[in-house]
Amino acid sequence: MMRSLFSGVSGMQNHQTRMDVIGNNVANVNTTGFKRGRVNFQDLISQQLSAAARPNEEVGGVNPKEVGLGVLIASIDTVHTQGALQTTGINTDVSIQGSGFFVLKSGEKTFFTRAGAFGVDNAGTLVNPANGMRVQGWMAQDVAGERLINSSAQTQDLVIPIGQKIDAQQTSTVHYACNLDKRLPELAADANEADVRKSTWTTDFQVYDSFGQQHTLQINFSRVPGTNNQWQATVAVDPGTEVDTQTRVGVGTSDGAANTFIVNFDNFGHLASVTDTAGNVTGPTGQVLLEASYDVVGANPDDAGQVTRHAFTLNLGEIGTARNTITQFAERSTTKAYRQDGYAMGYLENFKIDQSGVITGVYSNGVSQDIGQLALAGFANQGGLEKAGENTYVQSNNSGIANISTSGVMGKGKLIAGTLEMSNVDLTDQFTDMIITQKGFQAGAKTIQTSDTMLDTVLSLKR
């Protein structure tokens, strides 16, 4: 039989396989995170009719005479180029811009995917809603009062507990900065109520006790008569209420015996020192820290049977600078900056995912707290991954071991929430390959037809 018959058959068979791959690509043109396949051919073994001969003194060298026996599929590759990103606006949809794979688990088996169309089940677990596979990452933990994520630990299921309560936190530090107008008049001994209002700068802030109950922290500033660049500050928590909270303030770690202190400024309008009623004075440099406290109404007595008091630090800023501190300039009195770290009890209402994959919970009390972080996997040879269906891959002998870490580490891409990665199939390329494949298939068929005709010619010689 003619060798060309079998060459034609191999050509048709392998072009059919290439057409199968193209058809699968076209079918998945709108599949989230799909990566197109590509078929490469190589020639089959060749039959040697005569070997090569080296040149000698009489004649030159002769090349070998070989007849190829057809075509063979060299590889069917998965092309992991970046797909376009589609905006969805859904906060559980996440795409990877760059290399890397999301890590999923089903039982004890680990899968990898580029399709980040995730959702939250009724237990709060972040999953692939199409198959229930659980998204892997690291949950945040409370360590010494801080929320920390240990990305070097073993990955775990990510849980986003919508509706979960967060405990109230009492205020521990109040950072305060303002400008006191140097032009403000001194308060006369016989001043009336209108004069007091005109000569006093009053600021009100909100602080929280251990129950999460909100209290008003009021500080009144007035110039000390007869003394340049000196102001008296009076501190009160919940002023004007029926119950006196017995507010006290002092320099250092002592809350003092009264609720007033003296603020001194230098000739440049910068904070110079603070003196409490006991005569304690702050140092010449560094932060000005005062200890304030007040009675917590409604709290159980302490171990000594005394009224429970809530103590917090009042940070007035740094001596000798105008940045984030109290100043005295000839400008209108203003509160330039204020913040405190207490809050009431709240419920987890929403969450967001940043480029590092950190999931931040947004609570009803305005607090934002880290919940966890998405894990990404990288491979030495991502083309060696085996497809496992449902837009997932599994590790193979030639992919290398999964290197799991956060985004941006060891070449991994960044995460973009509210988007999905589209298929990287280009229909223009696929239809062009389809035409080329069809012509290759037809050429193989033509080879068989021509070989058949030649055999008929040979058989007709006997007639």
From Swiss-Prot:
One GO process term, biological-process aspect: bacterial-type flagellum-dependent swarming motility
Domain of life of the organism encoding this protein: Bacteria
Entry keyword Translocase: no
Annotated Pfam families: Flg_bb_rod (PF00460), Flg_bbr_C (PF06429), FlgE_D2 (PF07559), LlgE_F_G_D1 (PF22692)
PROSITE patterns according to UniProt: FLAGELLA_BB_ROD (PS00588)
Predominant location: other
Localization annotation: Bacterial flagellum basal body
Sorted UniProt keywords: Bacterial flagellum
GO cellular component: bacterial-type flagellum basal body; bacterial-type flagellum hook; cytosol
InterPro entries named among the record's database cross-references: Falgellar_hook_FlgE_sf, Flag_bb_rod_N, Flagellar_basal_body_rod_CS, Flagellar_FlgE/F/G, Flg_bb/hook_C_dom, FlgE/F/G-like, FlgE_D2, LlgE_F_G-like_D1
Protein family per UniProt: Belongs to the flagella basal body rod proteins family.
Protein name: Flagellar hook protein FlgE
Organism this protein belongs to: Treponema pallidum (strain Nichols)
Taxonomic classification: Bacteria, Pseudomonadati, Spirochaetota, Spirochaetia, Spirochaetales
This protein's encoding gene: flgE
